[in-house]
Structures are given as structure tokens and as C-alpha cells.
């Protein structure tokens, strides 16, 4: 097993009485993609901001490649790359000019910087747009230049904070493929997302975070074992039909373990989906709920989050 490149212990961040991050402890192994998965407001960005030396922790410790935060922040900044959730580019500058600016921030220059500019532009497949102003780029292209900026100085550890938010599916696919290529090249990535499917596709290990606390951590198989042999029934209702007030009535059905209403849909954790379906349909009919469709899902990270918190990842 690889050794950790990052270790946090009881990391906390408070703003007055508000506890944004509440004692988070985890390690990231060299060469892995480690995802922090949680809903908006869970504490993912605050955690990344502390680890990238943008925020000072209220308490706790973090060590990156033997350097301690915040005491050795200058050394840490030299070995990490950051892809922030917000686009960090100058609209009136070209892609190459933006990257040159960020290269200078890392004390890069001359032939070394020029070579790296060409390499990262090729890496994000934007060589042909290098001399175009960023203001003319799509959201997905801006995201890719953001990633290129984080890779310029060949960091040992790359932080990627929700890098696919607000972009089209094709751009999202390019970025996800790029993240996997980085891992294949030996890069260590700490990736935050509220998209369960991204965490499932990318991650070697996942930390599930909610309300500032890390509530579970492990490989996907390890996390899915928390749910046991359960399956998930997801009921979608017709227009004007919502199960919000009726969710608990489905717990009377034999084999139904838990029920949760999320945005008008009904999510049931069940022992065996096919066995409970007739009772579920009958109960919905008796309540006057028109079922549009039913999905049967094997245990996934969404089910794990629901099992641990009683709510869906996007129910926030």
C-alpha cells in the first residue's frame, strides 16, 4: 500500500459560533484519487481551502509531504496545485497569457515556462485556442484552462474543487477522462464533488462529508457494505403528485426498511425490491399517488449517504 502524501487530524474551522468543519481526519495516499463527497455546504471547499493554505485552521493539524500547515505554508504551496470551484482567469487575456501569469506566480520563467505552457495546453486539448481571449471561451474550456494552471508547476498533489459544476456534458466527460489520465501518470488528486456518479467513476477511496463532519471513509466496496444487502426503490410520480407527506406510510410494508421523500420523489431502502414492489404500488394507489416510473438500484454511494444521514445528496 502507498504511503500518505496528506494527513489531517481533527481539522476544524469556525467562524464565530458557526462550525464549518468539525474535526475532520483522513489521509490521501500517493497516486490515488481521493474524493470528498457531500452536498453543497457540507464543508468540502472549506477543507480544501485550509489544505491549500488559503484559510488558517481554527485547530487541528495537516501535513502534506512532511510539511506542516500552516507553519510551512510556503513549502506546501510549491508542491500543490489548485483547481478552484470559481474560474480564476482574466477574461481579457488569452489562454497563454493567463497561464503565463500563473507560471510567474510559481516563480517559473524563460524556456522552462514556455515548455510547460505548450505541454499543459496540449494536455487540456486547447493548443489551437492558446492565443484567443478567455472571454470567448465556453464554460467547459475555461474549466480546462483552470486545470492547466493548476498543473503548470508539476505539483505532487492536485486539489480539484467541484471542477465540473455548470458545464455541458461533453466538457464534463473530457474533464473526468483527464482526471483519470492524471492518476495514470502518477498524480495524486483530492477531488470534491456532490455528484455521486463522479465519485463512483473516479475514486480509489471516498470520504463522505456532511455538516462539516467526515461520516464515513473507505473504498467504494467498503462503503457499500455499510448498506448491507439492501436495494433502493426510487419512485417518480406524475405531475402534481408528490410523496412528501406520505413517505412514512410506506414503512408499514413488510421488507421496507426506510423511506425518504426527496424533491417529491420517494426513495425506499428495501430488503428485496421485487418482493416489495406489489405492496409499494398498492400503497401508492391507495394514497392517490400516480406513479410515472420506478427505478431499482443496487447499493451505491447515494444509498450509503442516504443510509448514514437520512437524506439525499442533493436534498439541500
Model regions and ranges:
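Conserved ABC ATPase "signature" region
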Residues: 100, 104-107, 111-129
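Conserved ABC transporter NBD signature motif
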Residues: 60-71, 75-76
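Conserved catalytic motifs of ABC-family nucleotide-binding domains
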Residues: 154
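ABC transporter nucleotide-binding domain
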Residues: 176-271
